[in-house]
Design a protein with these regions (language model features):
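C-terminal segments that line or cap access tunnels to active or ligand-binding sites in enzymes
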Residues: 338, 345-475, 545-548
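C-terminal lid/capping helical subdomain adjacent to the catalytic/cofactor pocket in oxidative enzymes
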Residues: 6, 487-573
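Active-site/ligand-binding neighborhood in enzyme catalytic cores
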Residues: 30-39, 211-314, 329, 337, ...
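Conserved beta-strand-loop-beta-strand element in the redox core of flavoprotein oxidoreductases
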Residues: 317-334
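N-terminal export signals
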Residues: 38, 44, 48-77
Length: 573
C-alpha cells in the first residue's frame, strides 16, 4: 500500500528543528540554504530551486547480477538433476513470487498457490480509471530511492521507474490545510522543535539493540504508550498534534490511540542526528505502465508453477518432518505433502488456517494478534488538473476537513485530465467502505473543493474504491504495531519454525508495509531454502546481490540493531 509522504516532511522538520537548535541558525534560513521548496499560502510566489536526481542503481549491482546469473545457471542443472522434492510457496504477492523466482533461477522447483484468482496480492493497478486513459494504483504505489531490492528486481525484469520528483518539479509539494487555512513548512518546523528534541532523547534511551527478545526498560515503557498519549504529553502546538494524528493514521492505518509510540519514534526520528533533505522515505518512484507489471512479469516466468484460486485451509506436521497441507480449489478439497513450506500470506489471512504445527508462543501470538491497518483508497477523475494549472500544486494535501490525505495518481500520464487519490486510515479507512463509491466521492469532493476552489466543476467519470479491510484474503492494508506489540513481536514474524518459512512485508525488519519489504523478505526466504538444500553458491549469489543493494539502501524506518538482527541465525528451528 502507499505510505504517507507526510512522514518525509516530518522527518525533515525534525532534522531541521534539531540543527537549528544546535547551530543557532533560524529554521527558515536553513530551508533556504538547502533549497527546500516551501509550501506557500495562495498568492505567494514559489521557489524554483532545482532538486537533483538520485541514481536508481549504483555501482556493483550489475556485477552482482552477472555473478548471480552465472551461478544460478551452473547450480540450476545440479538441482534439477538431483530431483529434489518440491517446495510450496503460499501466496503469489511480491514476496512469494520473488522467492519462487529466485529459487527458479537456482533450478529449484517450487509450487506456488494463490487464494485469489489473480496474482499480485496487495499490488493492483487499475487501467483507464474514471473514464480516462490513466491507470491508478489501488494498492502498493510508491517506491523509495532506498528500496534497492525492488528497484533491482524491476530493472532485471526490463521495467522503468518514473521519477515523480522530476515530473512534479516546480509545483508546491505538500499543502497543509488545517483549521480552515494553509500552514507553511516554516510554521510547522518552528512548532515541531520541542517535540523533535524529546524524540531524540527518547530514541537514545531505547538503546542500540532492539528485538522482542532484547529491549530496555525505556523501550518497554514507550511501547506501552500510545502515540496519542505521547504527543499529548509533549510540549508542542495543537497544529502539530493534528498533523501527527493525520500522519500516523494514514501512515500505518490505525488511529493514534491504538498505535505504539515506538511507531512514531522509529519512523519520524530515524535520522534525527543527520541532515537529509528527504528523510529515509521519499516515495519518489513508480513503475512506468503500472506497478502490477512487476508481479505479472514474475508470474510469466513462473506460469507453470502457479495455481490461482487455491486456498490453504490447514497445515500439519507429519512424523517424518514433512508437512501435509489441506487445500481447496472451488468445490474440490485435497491434500498434498511438502518438505518445505514458505508462508507469505498476511497474518490476518493465516489466522483462518488450521495450523497443526507446534509453534513457539511469541510466533503464535504474532500470528494471532499483530495489528493491521485499515487504509483504503478512493480515486476520482477530472477533466483537467486545476490543482496544477491554477494552484501550482501536486494535489498532495494533509487536512482535518474530513478526508486525511490526497495526491495526484499517476501524475506522469501524458493526458490533460487527471486523477486524485483520497487515502484514508483508522476509523475513516473503515468508514470509506460504507455506501457506494459515488456516495463517498461526493463527500470527498465537497471537502477537496475547499482546498482547490473550482475543482468540483471538473469532476468526470465514476469513482473507484479500493477497500482493503473488506478483502477476504488480506482483511487490511499492511502490518501496524499496536500498543505493546513492538516488545512482544518485533523480529519474530520472519523467524522460521523447522522447515516452515515466513516472508512478506509484515516480516520485514526495516520496510514493513512497503513493497520493498515483501521483495526483500522473499529473497531472504529463498536464500534460507537454498542454504538448507546445500546450494551454497546460489545462496551466496543472491546474498551478493543483496549486499550490493544494502550498501546503498536507506531503510524506510531505522530500528536500533535491525541489521544485526537480520543477520543473526534464526532462534526458532
Amino acid at each position: 500500500m502507499a505510505k504517507s509522504a507526510l512522514m518525509a516532511m516530518l522527518r525533515r522538520a525534525a532534522s531541521i528543528a534539531q540543527k537549528s537548535g544546535e547551530t543557532g541558525i533560524p529554521a527558515d534560513e536553513l530551508l533556504g540554504m538547502l533549497g527546500v521548496k516551501r509550501s506557500y499560502p495562495l498568492g505567494n510566489g514559489t521557489s524554483n530551486s532545482p532538486i537533483s536526481r538520485r541514481q536508481l542503481l549504483h555501482g556493483g549491482l550489475a556485477a552482482a547480477t552477472a555473478v548471480a546469473a552465472a551461478t544460478f545457471n551452473r547450480e540450476g542443472a545440479v538441482a534439477q538433476s538431483a530431483g529434489r522434492s518440491p517446495i510450496l510457496v503460499v501466496g503469489a504477492g511480491i514476496a512469494g513470487l520473488t522467492a519462487a523466482y529466485r529459487l527458479r533461477q537456482a533450478g529449484v522447483r517450487a509450487d506456488v498457490i494463490e487464494a485469489n484468482n489473480r496474482v499480485g496480492g496487495r499490488i493492483r493497478t487499475a487501467p483507464k480509471v474514471a473514464g480516462t486513459a490513466i491507470s491508478a494504483e489501488l494498492g502498493g504505489e510508491f517506491i523509495d530511492t532506498g528500496h534497492t531490492n525492488l528497484i533491482s528486481l524491476a530493472t532485471q525484469l526490463g521495467l522503468r521507474a518514473i521519477d515523480l520528483v522530476a515530473v512534479q518539479a516546480g509545483f508546491v509539494s505538500d499543502t497543509f490545510f488545517l483549521e480552515g487555512r494553509r500552514f507553511s513548512l516554516e510554521q510547522l518546523i518552528a512548532d515541531f522543535a520541542p517535540l523533535a528534541s524529546k524524540i531524540t532523547a527518547d530514541l537514545q534511551a531505547v538503546g542500540d539493540e532492539f528485538s522482542y527478545q532484547d529491549f530496555t526498560e525505556a523501550a518497554e515503557r514507550l511501547d506501552n504508550l500510545s502515540i496519542a498519549e505521547y504527543v499529548d504529553q509533549a510540549d508542542t502546538s495543537t497544529i502539530v498534534r493534528q498533523l501527527l494524528r493525520i500522519a500516523y493514521t494514514t501512515e500505518y492505518g490505525r488511529d493514534p490511540e491504538e498505535q505504539s509510540a515506538l511507531n512514531l519514534l522509529f519512523l519520524i526520528g530515524a535520522d534525527a542526528n543527520s541532515f537529509q533533505l528527504y528523510g529515509n522515505s521519499d516515495e519518489r518512484y513508480q513503475i512506468d505502465g503500472g506497478n502490477n507489471q512487476i508481479v505479472n512479469r514474475l508470474a510469466d516466468r513462473l506460469s507453470d508453477s502457479i495455481e490461482t484460486g487455491t486456498v490453504l485451509e490447514g497445515i500439519s506436521l507429519l512424523p517424518d518432518g514433512r508437512y501435509r497441507v489441506s487445500l481447496r480449489s472451488g468445490q474440490s478439497a485435497f491434500d498434498r505433502t511438502y518438505e518445505r513450506v514458505l508462508l507469505t500470506l498476511p497474518f490476518t489471512a493465516l489466522r483462518d488456517v488450521k495450523i497443526n504445527v507446534p509453534l513457539p508462543q511469541p510466533k503464535l501470538r504474532a500470528i494471532q494478534q499483530l495489528g493491521y491497518g485499515t487504509n483504503s483508497k478512493l480515486i476520482t477523475g477530472y477533466r483537467s488538473r486545476l490543482w496544477r494549472d491554477l494552484y501550482r500544486s501536486t494535489a498532495s494535501v494533509y487536512t482535518d476537513l474530513g478526508f486525511q490525505n490526497s495526491w495526484e495518481a499517476t501524475p506522469f500520464a501524458p493526458t490533460g485530465n487527471g486523477l486524485v487519490t483520497n487515502f484514508t486510515g483508522g476509523k475513516q479507512g473503515l468508514a470509506i467502505g460504507a455506501g457506494t463509491p459515488e456516495d463517498q466521492a461526493q463527500r470527498f469532493l465537497n471537502q477537496f473543493e475547499r482546498v482547490f476552489p473550482g475543482v468540483r466543476n471538473l469532476r468526470s467519470g465514476k469513482a473507484v474504491r479500493a477497500y482493503w479491510p473488506g478483502e477476504r484474503f488480506s482483511k487490511g492494508s499492511y502490518a501496524c504495531y499496536l500498543v505493546g506489540q513492538w516488545t512482544q513481536m518485533y523480529g519474530v514474524e520472519g523467524e522460521r519454525v523447522g522447515n516452515l518459512y515466513f516472508a512478506g512485508e509484515h516480516t520485514s525488519l526495516e520496510n514493513q508495509g512497503y513493497m520493498e519489504g515483501g521483495c526483500e523478505t522473499g529473497q531472504r526466504a529463498a536464500v534460507e531454502i537454498l542454504q538448507d538444500l546445500g546450494l551454497i553458491a546460489s545462496a551466496d549469489a543472491v546474498n551478493a546481490r543483496t549486499a550490493s543493494n544494502l550498501n546503498n539502501r536507506r531503510p524506510s524506518r531505522k530500528v536500533p540493531g535491525a541489521r544485526n538482527l537480520g543477520n543473526r541465525k534464526p532462534s526458532i528451528r
